[in-house]
């Protein structure tokens, strides 16, 4: 440039380097705006990640745990009957029907454990796959039980639904779950099978450990009182005698005559090991223990897992807790 303006014009390089822009932008924005933006991005990311997973509904907490084990990172599991809740007396809500409609697979125990499941599935309009986890399990039958469709005045042979109390049955459960998941998510079939077989090894170890623990108790001392008859499969597998004021479900209260007979049996057989279950009303068993002169032990987990901060948050934890408490109680007999 020439002329009179040449001396008055000065060129300055704009201060707009990348570093200066970044520094200015971040320092100028309010801290709470930055944090809110980061939180929103993280939430969007987690929602997108969850959307990629297979939605599965399990009828109750023990099944929910098994589905999570087999499904791993490929599934997101919703449980209808949660921790410390009683599936025998569960009443479905409209929200439960909505849950089914978003599921690709519904997993139930079967053997009459969830008498409400069929009605809920039909009422919800769910058209997807339903898996009965007890497929292939040899059911234990009991004569004279009332409930789950029995009617007063008639003999009724009822299948005991608590098949998970024998780890060998749970091996069938997880293999059935693996097959059910693979049916609706063929791409994950290898993963599901591998997870199931790895868990079967843990179940075999649990079975061996339980046998070793029970073996420390003399055979004539292996007697226990529990709230309801939920341990029949455990009893058959490990040679422990269980007595209960209630049958295989918790709906029907025992009569005064039945309670009196049980008290006499407890006293006659000198049973000191008495346990209440986490989802049962403890008043009956506590009074029974007092009247019979027995010792009330820690809670057992029969039909439901515990919350995460309690000792029965998973199936394996539940079983090990139960065995430990049972052995301690039977030592008092």
Task: Write out the residue ranges for each language-model feature.
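N-terminal secretory signal peptides that target proteins for export/translocation
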Residues: 1-28
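N-terminal export leaders
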Residues: 30-35
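Sec-dependent N-terminal signal peptides
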Residues: 36-40
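N-terminal signal peptide c-region/cleavage motif recognized by signal peptidases
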Residues: 45-47
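Extracytoplasmic metal-acquisition and chelation regions
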Residues: 50-333
């Amino acid at each position: 440039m020439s002329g009179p303006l040449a001396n008055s014009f000065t060129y300055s390089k704009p201060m707009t380097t990348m570093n200066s822009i970044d520094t200015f932008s971040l320092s100028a924005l309010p801290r709470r705006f930055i944090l809110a933006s980061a939180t929103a991005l993280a939430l969007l990311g987690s929602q997108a990640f969850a959307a990629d997973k297979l939605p599965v509904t399990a009828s109750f907490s023990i099944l929910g745990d098994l589905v999570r084990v087999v499904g791993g990172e490929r599934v997101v599991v919703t449980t209808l009957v949660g921790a410390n809740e009683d599936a025998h007396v569960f009443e479905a809500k409209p929200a439960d029907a909505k849950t089914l409609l978003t599921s690709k697979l519904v997993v139930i125990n079967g053997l009459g454990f969830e008498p409400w499941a069929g009605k809920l599935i039909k009422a919800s309009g769910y058209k997807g796959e339903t898996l009965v986890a007890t497929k292939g399990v040899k059911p234990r039958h009991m004569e004279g039980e009332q409930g789950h469709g029995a009617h007063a005045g008639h003999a009724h042979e009822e299948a005991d639904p608590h098949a998970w109390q024998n780890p060998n049955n749970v091996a069938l459960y997880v293999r059935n779950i693996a097959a059910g998941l693979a049916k609706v998510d063929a791409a994950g079939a290898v993963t599901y099978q591998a997870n199931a077989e790895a868990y079967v090894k843990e179940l075999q170890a649990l079975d061996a450990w339980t046998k070793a623990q029970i073996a420390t108790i003399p055979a004539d001392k292996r007697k226990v009182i529990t709230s309801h008859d939920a341990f029949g499969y455990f009893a058959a597998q490990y040679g422990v005698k269980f007595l209960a004021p209630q049958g295989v479900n918790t709906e029907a209260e025992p009569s005064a005559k039945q309670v009196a007979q049980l008290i006499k049996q407890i006293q006659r057989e000198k049973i000191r090991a008495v346990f209440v279950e986490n989802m049962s009303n403890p008043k009956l068993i506590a009074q029974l223990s007092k009247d019979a002169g027995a010792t009330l032990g820690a809670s057992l987990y029969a039909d439901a897992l515990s919350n995460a901060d309690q000792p029965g948050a998973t199936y394996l934890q539940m079983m090990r807790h139960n065995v430990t408490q049972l052995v301690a109680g039977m030592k008092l007999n």
